[in-house]
């Protein structure tokens, strides 16, 4: 039996990344959580941006847990701030890193499932430029596996290089979607790319 080569593409914090992109924000620098705040603070967060996760927030926690963790992180920032005072706030990670006197803030984006499906479909269309639909296994709205065994010779590329070519095509479309990928034939190699 011929050994098969697969590429796995996982759209990092997909719902949160889409919400950032739609606001003209960098998903790797924006504190944002996708949650239906109208349902109470016990609602489950559907996605959390990587920068917000860096404060110890779970990707699938409840909204009250996000608020509590941010409150705790702000208490630490206040303790360390000049004069033990926080003046203003920001939801941008880079701004918070530059100014320890600012409180951590974050955006709560209500979920828009139909829109995420549409967005995912547009990205899937990019995948189909390189791989036939019958060789793409859709695992979820934000994750696919591609059997690229028969395409490597055609494109004269390694699995990693083909994966990067596909990812760069997605990024070139100005979607600024952070992606993580795994590719290999018996091994996995990870690469991360942002904007």
Predicted regions: what is each one?
Residues 1-195:
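Gly/Gly-Pro- and Ser/Thr-rich, intrinsically disordered tail segments characteristic of DNA damage-repair
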């Amino acid at each position: 039996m011929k050994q098969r080569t697969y590429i796995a593409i996982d759209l990092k914090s997909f719902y949160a990344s889409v919400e950032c992109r739609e606001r003209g924000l960098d998903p790797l620098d924006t504190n944002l959580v996708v949650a239906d705040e109208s349902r109470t603070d016990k609602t489950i967060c559907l996605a959390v941006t990587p920068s917000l996760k860096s404060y110890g927030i779970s990707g699938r926690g409840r909204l009250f847990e996000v608020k509590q963790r941010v409150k705790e992180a702000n208490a630490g920032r206040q303790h360390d701030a000049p004069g033990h005072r926080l003046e203003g706030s920001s939801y941008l990670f880079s701004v918070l890193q530059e100014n320890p006197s600012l409180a951590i803030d974050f955006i709560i984006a209500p979920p828009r499932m139909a829109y995420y499906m549409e967005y995912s479909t547009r990205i899937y269309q990019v995948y189909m430029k390189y791989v036939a639909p019958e060789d793409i296994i859709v695992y979820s709205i934000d994750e696919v596996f591609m059997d690229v065994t028969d395409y490597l010779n055609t494109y004269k590329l390694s699995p990693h290089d083909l994966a990067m070519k596909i990812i760069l095509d997605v990024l070139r479309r100005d979607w600024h979607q952070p992606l993580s990928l795994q590719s290999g034939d018996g091994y996995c190699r990870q690469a991360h790319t942002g904007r």
